[in-house]
Amino acid sequence: MQTSQFASVDWRGNAIRIEYQWVGSADISKPLIVFLHEGLGSVAMWRDFPHQLCIAANCRGLVYSRPGYGKSSPRKRDEHWQVDFMHRQAFEVLPSLFRALNIDTEKQKPWLFGHSDGGSIALLFAAKYVQDTSGCIVLAPHIFVEDVTVRSIEKAKLTYETTDLRQKLARFHDDA
């Protein structure tokens, strides 16, 4: 994968750093696919999948790590995200990233490719900004919160706190 770049994005009155990479075609006239990672994901965890897909589809791609993931600005230790965190990512962070990268979604409507949390964020963005989206490709999005999901998050948290999962994630996330 390529070297990450960083964009400064204004979010909730704070300047945050967003890690991103351009992949696939370098031709800006080609369709754009934006990749939105899952709940423990980041730019690095996608590996070369976005690049390979964009080459096969003759598209350019934007892969980024949401705030609190990868090499983007870490979440404050005492910060607890509310249940609307995916809405905030879709309605606040993603449009701010597009502005920071000079992506005019009215002129070039991106395709959104999201996995899990990223799939939910893609669907939320596309529902609100229908006129600014070519379409969505989603894998295992969360349409509603299920008890099994809440239990799985609690189990993952315990695993993170009691095993070497923190060390394994550290190579993908600056604040693991």
Which residue stretches match the model-derived regions?
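Hydrophobic, aromatic-rich cap/lid helix
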Residues: 152, 170-176
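Active-site loop/oxyanion-hole signature of alpha/beta-hydrolase fold enzymes
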Residues: 63-111
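Conserved alpha/beta-hydrolase "nucleophile elbow" surrounding the catalytic nucleophile
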Residues: 114-116
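Flexible "cap/lid" loop of the alpha/beta hydrolase fold
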Residues: 123-128, 132-164
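Short, hydrophobic alpha-helix immediately C-terminal to the catalytic nucleophile
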Residues: 47, 95, 123-127
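Structural signature of beta-strand start/N-cap positions in the alpha/beta core
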Residues: 32, 60, 109-111, 135
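N-terminal cap/lid segment of alpha/beta-hydrolase-fold proteins
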Residues: 1-17
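Conserved HGGG/HGGXW glycine-rich cap/lid loop of the alpha/beta-hydrolase fold
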Residues: 21-75
